[in-house]
Amino acid sequence: MAQAQYAGTGRRKNAVARVRLVPGTGKITVNKKDVEEYIPHADLRLVINQPFAVTSTEGSYDVFVNVVGGGYAGQSGAIRHGIARALLQVDPDFRDSLKRAGLLTRDARMVERKKPGLKKARKASQFSKR
């Protein structure tokens, strides 16, 4: 018999993560690499595990992630968003706790575009009055 699989898509900045949850031991695989190998920063790995901590499901599911775009922080946020959405399929009762923790909300903040005549989005050359 086929094993239950739960899917979720997460987004953050320019990163898009497609997440699959399979009942297992808590192993997280990102782009066919172990999460410790793929994301070197321990604080970002804690971000990824937040949905499991909120729902008290640590070590209950193996996570398989395909993530593209963005950097480490954006990808970690996208993975967190995808895991939270997949956990909703596992048990709809998780919605209240995940929503209260702010894990189901897509973070709409994006990089501000560079404007012509400026060095960056807001950085201008020094203003001289006279």
From Swiss-Prot:
Top-level taxon of origin:
Bacteria
Q: What's a Pfam family this protein contains?
A: Ribosomal_S9
The UniProt keyword set, sorted, is: Ribonucleoprotein, Ribosomal protein
Tell me a GO biological process for this protein. translation
UniProt KW Ribonucleoprotein keyword: yes
Q: Which HAMAP family match?
A: Ribosomal_uS9_B
Family in the record: Belongs to the universal ribosomal protein uS9 family.
Write down what this protein is called. Small ribosomal subunit protein uS9
Species for this entry: Streptococcus equi subsp. zooepidemicus (strain MGCS10565)
Native organism taxonomy? Bacteria, Bacillati, Bacillota, Bacilli, Lactobacillales
